[in-house]
A protein has these predicted regions:
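Short acidic active-site motifs
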Residues: 20-21
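Chitinase-like catalytic core of GlcNAc-active glycosidases
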Residues: 2-16, 26, 39-169
Length: 169
């Protein structure tokens, strides 16, 4: 016997998306993940180059949850696992980033956080897991759900930089 469960459908979009395409897509989504915010080496938030407020408004007008997507993109718009490493091993940077995220989400009206860190180093696996737990706890206290984007994994012992730094369990 199969149990019915509602599906949550997320869509990622850059703030420079054509507004007509966004409006056509929103009725099919549960959440709109605005792509993306990055961060600096010292833990400051890097917003998208194009204003994202209009997307948040469109999402809410269509009963879709707008989510801030935090990536490991650096100031050159490249995924940077050294940036992740530096963040994960510095309490002050983590606190600065979490504080900045909470402020940005409150100010702009985001209703959730999607974490999309690419290329977490294998040696950072446990530190990343602790960071996700801490970030989730802080966000949940403020009423924000947190999701983590993951590369598809086909086995427990799968090798590769997309998998080894992530504790899928």
């Amino acid at each position: 016997q199969k149990l019915w469960r509602p599906a949550a459908i997320k869509g990622y979009a850059y703030p420079f998306i054509d507004s007509g395409i966004l409006r056509q897509t929103l009725p099919y989504l549960t959440s709109l993940c605005v792509f993306s915010y990055g961060f600096t080496e010292d833990g400051r938030l890097i917003p998208p180059k194009t204003d994202d407020r209009w997307m948040i408004g469109e999402a809410k007008a269509n009963s879709v949850r707008p989510e801030l997507t935090l990536t490991s993109l650096n100031e050159q718009d490249q995924f940077d696992n050294l940036l992740i490493h530096a963040l994960l091993h510095d309490e002050e940077r983590k606190e600065r980033l979490i504080f900045a995220l909470l402020n940005e989400m409150k100010e702009k009206g985001y209703e959730g956080l999607d974490l999309d860190f690419e290329y977490v180093q294998a040696e950072d696996r446990d530190a990343y897991t602790r960071f996700v737990a801490r970030l989730t706890e802080r966000m949940n206290v403020e009423g924000y759900p947190v999701s983590v984007a993951l590369a598809p994994k086909t086995s427990d012992d799968q090798r590769g930089i997309l998998y080894e730094g992530i504790d899928y369990a």
